[in-house]
Curated annotation (Swiss-Prot):
Protein name: Phospholipase A2 homolog PLA2-03
Annotated function: Snake venom phospholipase A2 homolog that lacks enzymatic activity. Is myotoxic and displays edema-inducing activities in mouse paw. A model of myotoxic mechanism has been proposed: an apo Lys49-PLA2 is activated by the entrance of a hydrophobic molecule (e.g. fatty acid) at the hydrophobic channel of the protein leading to a reorientation of a monomer.
Tissue expression remark: Expressed by the venom gland.
Provenance organism: Ovophis okinavensis (Ryukyu Island pit viper)
Record's keyword annotation contains Iron: no
Site (Hydrophobic membrane-disruption site (MDiS)): L130
Length: 137
């Protein structure tokens, strides 16, 4: 479990409910899958540094933009509730902010799953100085 936490921290840096995002990815994709994204491309990990290198990197870019749009919420600290129903992630709770944070994490998790075939090992630990200016959110 400690490894999962470290991987989650690498995945989104200081953004979001790291434990929950890491758990969500782990549950959706299996053991060890989350660590593939810790330093991937220009947008996975801490900061948003450039144009996405591929569809997998775009998942991280879209996730960070999703957080950025949550102006009345604090995705860095807001914890949320979610469950699995018939293989689908279901965001719960009555608080609109935490539900929106959950929806951002859910979208990222599904994006990673749906783009597994675009994952390219050459971007696994990508030098950030090669990243070009990021696209606007």
């Amino acid at each position: 479990m400690r490894t999962l936490w470290i991987v989650a921290v690498l995945l989104v840096g200081v953004e979001g409910s790291l434990i929950q995002l890491g758990e969500m990815i782990f549950q959706e994709m299996g053991k060890g899958a989350a660590k593939k994204y810790g330093l991937y491309g220009c947008n996975c990990g801490m900061g948003r540094r450039g144009r996405p290198q591929d569809a997998t990197d775009r998942c991280c870019s879209v996730h960070k933009c999703c957080y950025k749009k949550l102006t009345d919420c604090d995705p860095k600290t807001d914890r949320y509730s979610y469950s699995w129903e018939n293989g689908d992630i279901v965001c719960g709770g009555d608080d609109p902010c935490t539900k929106e944070v959950c929806e951002c994490d859910k979208a990222a998790t599904i994006c990673f799953r749906d783009n597994l075939d675009t994952y390219d090992k050459k971007y696994k630990i990508f030098p950030k100085f090669l990243c070009k200016k990021p696209e606007p959110c």
